[in-house]
Swiss-Prot record:
Its EC number is 2.8.1.7. Its cofactor is pyridoxal 5'-phosphate. It comes from Rickettsia massiliae (strain Mtu5). GO terms for cellular component: L-cysteine desulfurase complex. It is an enzyme of class 2 (transferase). Pfam families: Aminotran_5. Pyridoxal 5'-phosphate binds at A80, T81, N160, Q188, S208, G209, H210, T248. This is Cysteine desulfurase IscS. The gene is iscS.
Length: 410
């Protein structure tokens, strides 16, 4: 028995894009607001309310600092899905009497695409920009898609499935020159890569707590004040959050998001070094041991905590079953229950066979070198076994083009 394995806790968590474990420091900061500091932050007549309000405002400033925003520009929501809906539908509803066109990208998160499809039914025209084979948009195509009717461009910073980083600074520059609002779903990049809303000319940005070692059920929407961006609220009520998002604020969750943002701000460089080192170790060791493994998405223009790999000649589902000691996913967590190949990979022009073999491995703050080495050994031995059993792999080795095969119907 390898004594090293005694120290490993199985299964190993490698699904950091789906969610992250809460940082113990975040948990510690939240606990008092569940017990003794339980006041409603909107109660202005006593110290319980003032205490909660102070905690909320401190957290708001921590979130703002991480993206170079003003504290007043941060609106708390239940998460990035709500933030994306509020940004896209809120802009569309407020400005629809002036303009009727929105531009987004085929590889956006499902909630952005669904919000856009919903608006299409209401008569808003949507352009879905294609992506290049490396997963990144073409800036000229974006420029040409903008018309005098365009009110919003929505492009995420880090793709949740393949980890590529879109050129936000250039996109923001184009939008500002053309007088179009720029929204970005920054859930996968917030606290992981440097994002400055002013440098990138971002007008709206969606944030999620549980992607940065904070609690689930809390997020934020950055809404620019100068030049002012107006959104019609989705939720009406007491007029909290500058009238954009009514409802009593969940103080413990907000404190957790604030603390997670504060830690990310002070430890981003350390986290990045750690993740980049493990990415290189993981990828290089897999490539050394097995052939025909493809990294999906641009190798350099990416967040390296996301490693999406296609293993030719085997099915993604059979890989997941074979490596059940690793918590990984095929596609995004929201759609990984369906057996359809990933729409993101298909939109990059990756064939159905290869798209079906894709697995997303996530590396994060708490991933260890030992876990990565264990994962590499497990993956390589299981892929070898699965390929031995795979008639498709055998045919590929004989040089048969699988695309040209006509399968008989039984």
């Amino acid at each position: 028995m390898n004594p090293q394995l005694n120290k490993l806790t199985l299964p190993i968590y490698m699904d950091y894009q789906a969610t992250t474990p809460i940082d113990p420091r975040v948990m510690e900061a939240m606990l008092p607001y569940f017990t003794t500091k339980f006041g409603n932050p909107h109660s202005r007549s006593h110290s319980f309310g003032w205490e909660a309000e102070n905690a909320v405002e401190e957290a708001r400033s921590m979130v703002a600092k991480l993206i170079g925003a003003d504290t007043k520009e941060i609106i708390f929501t239940s998460g990035a899905t709500e933030s994306n809906n509020l940004a896209i539908k809120g802009i569309a509803k407020f400005y629809s009497n002036k303009k009727n066109h929105i531009i987004t990208v085929v590889s956006e998160h499902k909630c952005v695409l669904d919000a856009c499809r919903h608006l299409e039914q209401e008569g808003i025209k949507i352009t879905y920009l294609p992506i290049k084979p490396n997963g990144i948009i073409d800036l000229e195509t974006l420029k040409n898609a903008i018309t005098d009717q365009t009110m919003l461009v929505s492009v995420m910073v880090v793709n949740n499935e393949i980890g590529v980083v879109q050129p936000l600074k250039e996109i923001g520059k184009i939008c500002r020159e053309k007088g179009v609002f720029f929204h970005s779903d920054i859930a996968q990049g917030f606290g992981k890569i440097p994002i400055d809303v002013n440098e990138f000319n971002i007008d709206l940005a969606s944030i999620s707590g549980h992607k940065i070692y904070g609690p689930k059920g809390i997020g934020a929407l950055y809404v620019r004040k100068k030049p002012r961006v107006r959104v019609t609220p989705l939720i009406n009520g007491g007029g909290q959050e500058r009238g954009m998002r009514s409802g009593t604020l969940p103080t413990p969750l907000i404190v957790g998001l604030g603390m997670a943002a504060e830690i990310a701000y002070s430890e981003m460089e350390k986290d990045t070094k750690h993740v980049n080192y493990l990415f290189d170790r993981f990828l290089n060791n897999i490539h050394k041991r097995i052939s025909e493994v493809y990294l999906n998405g641009d190798k350099n223009q990416r967040y390296k905590g996301n490693v999406n790999l296609s293993f030719a000649g085997v099915e993604g589902e059979s890989i997941i079953l074979a490596i059940k000691d690793l918590a990984v996913s095929s596609g995004s967590a929201c759609t990984s229950a369906s057996l359809e190949p990933s729409y993101v990979l298909r939109s990059m022009g990756i064939g159905e066979e290869l798209a079906h073999t894709a697995i997303r491995f996530g590396i994060g703050r708490f991933t260890t070198e030992q876990e990565v080495d264990y994962a590499v050994n497990l993956i390589c031995s299981k892929i070898d076994k699965l390929r031995e059993l795979s008639p498709l792999w055998e045919m590929m080795q004989e040089g048969i083009d699988l695309k040209k095969i006509k399968w008989a119907v039984h």
